[in-house]
């Protein structure tokens, strides 16, 4: 049985607004990105999801019907870059520090994996026993246990991740 999100948290499909995306990356310890870079994330992605948090009502904010909507914040995100057929890259896995250690990253990752698994091409290939899709990510130290727990394995020594070092 799937674990439920803690009270006040909700999973949504889509991408955070560019400013929220940048702040969440920065606050979670990922590399800083510009607003211009963040604005093209939705068009350059295959799928994304995020988790929002709304604090429980208190006597103060119950007076104002819009209080909970105003207090809702996006606290976790992740996305998939891919072709929809066989090649997928998990990216931008981030959880706000104040909301870590609650299983939110696990919920985001499981939602991303399930989206890949349930896509028509992948589902058909998995059912027929055809070549499996290639799903990869770059695993920074804080996320490695999470990724291993969800079935990811190190590719070394067969292959190693590399990046272009810009001048």
What residue spans do the PLM features occupy?
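Short amphipathic alpha-helix that is part of the acyltransferase structural core
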Residues: 1-36
């Amino acid at each position: 049985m799937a674990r439920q999100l803690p009270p006040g948290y909700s999973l949504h499909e889509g991408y955070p607004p560019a400013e929220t995306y940048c702040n969440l990356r920065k606050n979670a310890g990922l590399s800083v990105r510009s607003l211009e870079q963040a604005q093209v994330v939705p068009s350059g992605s295959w799928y994304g999801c995020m988790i929002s948090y709304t604090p429980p009502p208190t006597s103060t904010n119950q007076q104002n019907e819009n209080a909970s909507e105003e207090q809702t914040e996006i606290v976790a995100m992740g996305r998939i870059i891919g072709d929809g057929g066989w090649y997928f890259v998990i990216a931008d896995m981030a959880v706000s520090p104040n909301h870590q250690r609650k299983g939110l990253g696990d919920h985001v990752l499981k939602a991303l994996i399930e989206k890949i698994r349930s896509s028509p091409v992948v589902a058909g290939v998995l059912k027929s026993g055809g070549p499996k899709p290639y799903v990869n990510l770059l695993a920074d130290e804080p996320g490695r246990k999470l990724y291993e727990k969800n079935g990811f394995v190190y590719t070394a020594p067969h292959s190693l991740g590399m990046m272009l070092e810009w001048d």
